[in-house]
């Protein structure tokens, strides 16, 4: 309350007050207020990475992943070796790609006889995800690892490199079970 009062009555002190408010709102995880203060600070200092990071975190807290990704990419436009932005984008694309691959595998397994869509179409879909999202994740993780290598990044890069377009094999139990469920 005191900071808001000072900000209102002493306009020349706004930037300093906003810095303190931003820190407070980040600590409280108050995404809407973080976003408001960060935008106000960015209007004066658009290239400030700390403000952009706070804005990206707030957007993520609000569930706006796409906008958070764009802000993180803006950070990389300013500093292409920013560890946090590269790590965030690597994680984002890795998760997005793995979710798509899992969805394709599930769809393939649910296709009772493999007749609705041929296996080659599923493989092509998986190849596309690996070439797009997974390759993007590997690129960002590789840059982050060059800046500050750690075990997590090495494991993620290894795991992502091991992904393939191979289709899952269903056991003899799953297909009959799925058929029975569909009939009931």
What are these model-derived regions, one by one?
Residues 9-10, 44, 78, 147:
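Structural marker of alpha-solenoid helical repeat scaffolds
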Residues 2-6, 40-41, 74-75, 144:
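Canonical positions in the second alpha-helix
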Residues 13-14, 48, 82, 150-152:
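Residue-level recognition of tetratricopeptide repeat
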Residues 20-24, 55, 89, 96, ...:
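Structural register within alpha-helical repeat arrays
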Residues 16-17, 51, 85, 153-155:
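TPR alpha-solenoid repeat register
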Residues 1, 95-140:
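Short coil/linker segments at helix-helix boundaries
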